[in-house]
């Protein structure tokens, strides 16, 4: 059986996008991993699946599978690629679509200049809802934010815990390019305080409207950009009194713009979404 796909990226965060409405998709975890493999498959940080919605008030259902075969709640860069995909494939003529994700609904808008704006919803800051086990950890306040001390490779690192539909631990560092992201990232990802694992963000403040960001993504490792990670970092920075909205987020893959008015207001992310190529892959070539 041949599986049709489209290869896309959002600021270098790359995806295999599958139309699950017009073709049957039923892959094993091993097949998901092989499809995402840069040696044995197409290669991607994550795989995005377009499906029919399960509720009447949305246009599509949006599923995300990590490179390790695990399914996750949300991906902001993927959401931008999602709306470009359904538009380019003629699956909708709307410029703005409502999309069902694992734990809610998001709104995606294709702008006239080709950029895509995603209404990411309000951030979740209550530890139990991140989810994050804060009990017993050292803590102190900075601005309106609570910082928690995690033991990481023999050091105590202070993080903010934020959910943007998926969990994030955000840490402010002086020099993000020379910070040991590849060493600390997996330790934070698997820290027992995060029962569902966590995306680890490392943020350097440039000025009150700009940051540099690296993210070690849960189930994918360090990626060139992470949309939900950019949102979580800006939320944490604003709450700590370090940033003012809007904020330009510089990643290795490109620039995103994040706006948030605080409190229960939604976070809005704007950035690029690029189609690279289309193809098909023989599922028989993938391990079962």
From Swiss-Prot:
<dbReference type="Pfam" id="PF01678">
    <property type="entry name" value="DAP_epimerase"/>
</dbReference>
<feature type="binding site">
    <location>
        <begin position="217"/>
        <end position="218"/>
    </location>
    <ligand>
        <name>substrate</name>
    </ligand>
</feature>
<dbReference type="InterPro" id="IPR001653">
    <property type="entry name" value="DAP_epimerase_DapF"/>
</dbReference>
<dbReference type="GO" id="GO:0009089">
    <property type="term" value="P:lysine biosynthetic process via diaminopimelate"/>
</dbReference>
<feature type="active site" description="Proton acceptor">
    <location>
        <position position="226"/>
    </location>
</feature>
<dbReference type="GO" id="GO:0005829">
    <property type="term" value="C:cytosol"/>
</dbReference>
<comment type="function">
    <text>Catalyzes the stereoinversion of LL-2,6-diaminopimelate (L,L-DAP) to meso-diaminopimelate (meso-DAP), a precursor of L-lysine and an essential component of the bacterial peptidoglycan.</text>
</comment>
<feature type="site" description="Could be important to modulate the pK values of the two catalytic cysteine residues">
    <location>
        <position position="168"/>
    </location>
</feature>
<comment type="subunit">
    <text>Homodimer.</text>
</comment>
<feature type="active site" description="Proton donor">
    <location>
        <position position="75"/>
    </location>
</feature>
<feature type="binding site">
    <location>
        <position position="66"/>
    </location>
    <ligand>
        <name>substrate</name>
    </ligand>
</feature>
<keyword id="KW-0413">Isomerase</keyword>
<protein>
    <recommendedName>
        <fullName>Diaminopimelate epimerase</fullName>
        <ecNumber>5.1.1.7</ecNumber>
    </recommendedName>
</protein>
<feature type="binding site">
    <location>
        <position position="199"/>
    </location>
    <ligand>
        <name>substrate</name>
    </ligand>
</feature>
<keyword id="KW-0457">Lysine biosynthesis</keyword>
<dbReference type="InterPro" id="IPR018510">
    <property type="entry name" value="DAP_epimerase_AS"/>
</dbReference>
<feature type="binding site">
    <location>
        <position position="46"/>
    </location>
    <ligand>
        <name>substrate</name>
    </ligand>
</feature>
<feature type="binding site">
    <location>
        <begin position="76"/>
        <end position="77"/>
    </location>
    <ligand>
        <name>substrate</name>
    </ligand>
</feature>
<dbReference type="GO" id="GO:0008837">
    <property type="term" value="F:diaminopimelate epimerase activity"/>
</dbReference>
<feature type="binding site">
    <location>
        <position position="166"/>
    </location>
    <ligand>
        <name>substrate</name>
    </ligand>
</feature>
<feature type="binding site">
    <location>
        <begin position="227"/>
        <end position="228"/>
    </location>
    <ligand>
        <name>substrate</name>
    </ligand>
</feature>
<comment type="pathway">
    <text>Amino-acid biosynthesis; L-lysine biosynthesis via DAP pathway; DL-2,6-diaminopimelate from LL-2,6-diaminopimelate: step 1/1.</text>
</comment>
<keyword id="KW-0028">Amino-acid biosynthesis</keyword>
<feature type="site" description="Could be important to modulate the pK values of the two catalytic cysteine residues">
    <location>
        <position position="217"/>
    </location>
</feature>
<comment type="similarity">
    <text>Belongs to the diaminopimelate epimerase family.</text>
</comment>
<keyword id="KW-0963">Cytoplasm</keyword>
<feature type="binding site">
    <location>
        <position position="13"/>
    </location>
    <ligand>
        <name>substrate</name>
    </ligand>
</feature>
């Amino acid at each position: 059986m041949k599986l049709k796909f489209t290869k896309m990226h959002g600021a270098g965060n790359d995806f295999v996008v599958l139309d699950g409405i017009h073709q049957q998709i039923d892959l094993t975890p091993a097949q998901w991993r092989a499809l995402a493999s840069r040696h044995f498959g197409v290669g991607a940080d994550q795989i995005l699946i377009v499906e029919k919605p399960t509720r009447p008030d949305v246009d599509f259902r949006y599923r995300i599978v990590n490179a390790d075969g695990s399914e996750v709640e949300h991906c902001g860069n993927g959401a931008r690629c999602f709306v470009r995909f359904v538009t380019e494939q003629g699956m909708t003529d709307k410029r703005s679509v409502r999309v069902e994700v694992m734990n809610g609904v998001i709104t995606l808008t294709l702008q006239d200049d080709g950029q895509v704006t995603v209404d990411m919803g309000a951030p979740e800051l209550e530890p139990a809802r991140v989810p994050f086990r804060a009990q017993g950890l050292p803590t102190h306040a900075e601005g309106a934010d609570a910082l928690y001390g995690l033991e990481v490779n023999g050091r105590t690192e202070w993080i903010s815990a934020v959910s943007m539909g998926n969990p994030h631990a955000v840490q402010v560092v002086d020099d993000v390019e020379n910070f040991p992201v590849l060493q600390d990232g997996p330790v934070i990802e698997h820290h027992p305080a995060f029962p569902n694992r966590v995306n680890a963000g490392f943020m350097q403040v440039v000025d009150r409207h700009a940051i540099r960001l690296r993210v070690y993504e849960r189930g994918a490792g360090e990626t060139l950009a992470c949309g939900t990670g950019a949102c979580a970092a800006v939320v944490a920075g604003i709450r700590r009194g370090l940033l003012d909205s809007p904020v330009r987020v510089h990643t290795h893959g490109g620039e995103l713009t994040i706006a948030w008015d605080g409190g229960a207001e939604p976070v809005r992310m704007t950035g690029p979404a690029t189609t690279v190529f289309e193809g098909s892959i023989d599922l028989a070539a993938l391990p079962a």
